[in-house]
């Protein structure tokens, strides 16, 4: 990993408070020591797979609940037990885990929130149980943002004696670090762009609108909302035909590490390249880089610089 020592000096001093490198996510206790059983509530993508491998290597017993239509095929083989559960059957999640002696769980992976919340046939495709209906009226009827959804799920699991824990603890070596992480260096224009855009991203995240903005020549091209980062990248590329724009991605101040931690992977880099981006600025300590070495290699190969920005500032 090249350039961190020299290029970290290019990060503005306002980004470098004493607590800067600790990130802004809510810090939760680490998983209990092995062989304590851990529940894994898994959506889609490779993150649940990587966490399962890490937990298994650490010596934990893994009891996995795969969300219907979301989980990856290789996941059952990495877990001691596996069961598919309905996406909106949240009342059953805690009961199933508690029944087999699980008191701690990690919830990770992708779920298409747009389809889940706004599909006209959502109640037919994903029939909710009574716990989900109750959670809707307590938490989500007036606020459907990610933190409200997490609170509803955590509360329901807690009723069954299952506590959600820090989803990044098993993979802390996969988090973004301060400074330039790639051999490929950002241009002066790209540095100016992420310095310009970062305070705006912080405001977007405080409102829990999204976790990313796209910027070029000190002008915001796109803001992420419910569509997710991949679709937002595609939209930014369509709006900005000029090459070399920058994507800034971070975590909401006070964000809860129990779920929805900002995540990028090799596909993110490939999507950025296809859309004409030239730089990716990530919140250091707050963004997961799935298979980090592969991500950095892909970025260098495709000419995209990746910079970690400490985020403990307002």
Question: Where are the regions that the model predicts?
Answer:
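Feature captures the catalytic cores and cofactor-binding loops of soluble hydro-lyases/lyases
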Residues: 68-92, 98-102, 124-128, 132, ...
């Amino acid at each position: 990993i090249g350039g961190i020592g020299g290029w970290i000096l290019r990060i503005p001093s306002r980004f470098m408070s004493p607590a800067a490198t600790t990130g802004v996510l809510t810090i939760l206790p680490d998983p209990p020591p092995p062989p304590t059983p851990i529940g894994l509530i898994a959506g889609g993508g490779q993150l649940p797979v990587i966490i399962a491998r890490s937990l298994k290597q650490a010596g934990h017993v893994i009891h996995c609940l795969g969300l219907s239509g979301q989980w990856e095929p290789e996941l059952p083989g990495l877990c001691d037990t596996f069961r598919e559960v309905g996406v909106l059957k949240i009342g059953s999640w805690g009961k199933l885990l508690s029944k087999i002696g699980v008191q701690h769980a990690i919830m990770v992976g992708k779920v298409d929130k747009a389809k889940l919340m706004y599909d006209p046939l959502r109640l037919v495709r994903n029939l909710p149980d009574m716990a989900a209906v109750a959670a809707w009226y307590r938490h989500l009827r007036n606020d459907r943002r990610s933190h409200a959804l997490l609170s509803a799920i955590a509360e329901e699991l807690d009723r069954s004696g299952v506590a959600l824990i820090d989803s990044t603890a098993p993979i802390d070596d996969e988090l973004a670090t301060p400074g330039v992480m790639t051999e490929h260096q950002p241009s002066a224009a790209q540095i100016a762009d992420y310095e310009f855009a970062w305070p705006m991203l912080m405001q977007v995240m405080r409102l829990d609108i999204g976790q990313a903005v796209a910027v070029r020549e000190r002008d915001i091209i796109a803001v992420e909302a419910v569509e997710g980062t991949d679709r937002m990248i595609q939209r930014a590329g369509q709006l900005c035909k000029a090459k070399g724009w920058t994507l800034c991605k971070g975590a909401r101040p006070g964000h809860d590490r129990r779920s929805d931690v900002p995540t990028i992977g090799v596909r993110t880099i490939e999507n950025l390249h296809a859309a004409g981006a030239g730089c990716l600025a990530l919140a250091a300590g707050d963004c997961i880089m799935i298979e980090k070495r592969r991500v950095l290699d892909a970025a260098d190969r495709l000419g995209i610089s990746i910079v970690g920005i400490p985020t403990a500032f307002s």
